[in-house]
């Protein structure tokens, strides 16, 4: 067969998984990467693992359903701002009142096809001490000099804490990934239930 018949946490990690993750991390300009069975699970697994009780997730109203479901699975409070409206985003960040917050946004929005205003989103994230996650599902292979997505397109890879991607669009396959700094990926390996309790890619 073609499956590993086990979780990545147990017997489901092969050399080809590690090689794939290294290549994906290099593509999007991050230290490390974690491959999930699907892009949907990547969003669920990342968001629900890193946002805890008393913390906030701030999302665009047009964000993908997998982002919304990840928020609902977390212990955090979800705040939604009007589509690509920076004043509305800032109001949400003010409402978070200095508590830990994660902004999650599509690089390219799946229904409208427009691009997120990442320069201003990143600036607001920095101003209010929020972390930033960009879903590159529809921008991977489309934006950026190397096709790495919206974060690369705007020169904001270093200021983007988490980059999510899927294999089901430009790459015409099945799977998804989260790329970030090594300590964050190490944390997800041990806390992301969508990874731990699912058979590997």
Would you name each region that the model predicts?
Residues 2-39:
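Conserved N-terminal alpha-helix of the aminotransferase class I/II PLP-enzyme fold
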Residues 46-65:
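Conserved PLP-anchoring active-site segment centered on the Schiff-base-forming lysine
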Residues 49, 65-75, 79:
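Active-site-proximal loop->helix
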Residues 62, 108, 137-138:
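Conserved Walker B
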Residues 79-134:
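Active-site phosphate-binding strand-loop segment of PLP-dependent enzymes
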Residues 152-187:
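Active-site PLP attachment segment
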């Amino acid at each position: 067969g073609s499956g590993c018949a086990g979780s990545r946490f147990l017997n489901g990690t092969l050399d080809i998984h590690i090689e794939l993750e290294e290549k994906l991390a290099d593509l999007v300009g991050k230290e490390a990467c974690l491959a999930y069975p699907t892009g949907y699970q990547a969003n669920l697994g990342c968001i629900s693992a890193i946002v805890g009780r008393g913390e906030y997730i701030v999302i665009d109203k047009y964000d993908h359903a997998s982002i919304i479901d990840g928020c609902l699975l977390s212990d955090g409070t979800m705040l939604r701002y009007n589509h690509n409206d920076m004043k509305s985003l800032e109001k949400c960040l003010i409402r978070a009142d200095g508590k830990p917050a994660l902004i999650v946004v599509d690089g390219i929005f799946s229904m409208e096809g427009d691009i997120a205003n990442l320069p201003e989103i990143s600036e607001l994230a920095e101003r209010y001490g929020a972390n930033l996650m960009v879903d590159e599902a529809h921008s991977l292979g489309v934006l950026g000099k190397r096709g790495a997505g919206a974060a690369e397109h705007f020169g904001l890879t270093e200021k983007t804490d988490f980059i999510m991607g899927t294999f089901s669009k430009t790459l015409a396959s099945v799977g998804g990934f989260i790329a970030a700094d090594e300590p964050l990926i190490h944390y997800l390996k041990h806390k992301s239930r969508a990874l731990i309790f699912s058979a590997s890619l």
